[in-house]
């Protein structure tokens, strides 16, 4: 009888211990996915100064756009918390959209080979960033689901695991931008 009791306790401990390990593993997957998002955000931030310099040659009087990009880039690179990084990345995205829309007003710029190469690199980076955001959000969903269920919620409370924040698009990012060819 005693042996059964110990065996039952041992099995229960092992089964619930696996739940703790799963939460730890999922938290690490979230962190890994976030580092890939950061990697692509950094790639974008490194690419933009070259794009800005190319555009400046054609659109010197568009100082406001260049200031917006510089400020947004500085905010993104200086952000420390995940929430701040997400917010500044969305702000940076809006500034990049303004820069890209400038090319519509300057046909010579659109024809510039360096500008085209940089735009192709930016498009590739944006695609990779979209993929990494999706992977990050999927990892967050799995993790958050597990720490809200049983026995994950118990282990989350014991281990101090809290919910992770999704990478959400800024409100303006959901609207289709207007492009004018006048």
Where are these regions (language model features)?
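A helix-centric hydrophobic-segment signal that preferentially recognizes long
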Residues: 2-182
């Amino acid at each position: 009888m005693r042996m059964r009791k110990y065996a039952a306790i041992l099995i229960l401990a092992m089964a619930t211990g696996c739940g703790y390990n799963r939460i730890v593993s999922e938290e690490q997957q979230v962190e890994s996915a976030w580092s890939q998002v950061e990697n692509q955000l950094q790639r974008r931030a490194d690419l933009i100064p070259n794009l800005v310099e190319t555009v400046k040659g054609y659109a010197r009087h568009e100082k406001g756009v260049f200031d917006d990009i510089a400020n947004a880039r500085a905010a993104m690179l200086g952000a420390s918390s995940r929430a701040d990084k997400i917010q500044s990345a969305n702000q940076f995205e809006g500034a990049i959209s303004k820069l890209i829309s400038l090319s519509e007003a300057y046909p010579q710029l659109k024809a510039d080979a360096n500008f085209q190469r940089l735009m192709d690199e930016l498009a590739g980076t944006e695609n990779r960033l979209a993929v990494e955001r999706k992977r990050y959000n999927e990892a967050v969903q799995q993790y958050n689901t597990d720490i809200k269920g049983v026995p994950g919620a118990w282990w989350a409370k014991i281990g101090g695991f809290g919910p992770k924040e999704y990478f959400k698009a800024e409100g303006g990012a959901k609207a289709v931008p207007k492009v004018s060819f006048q």
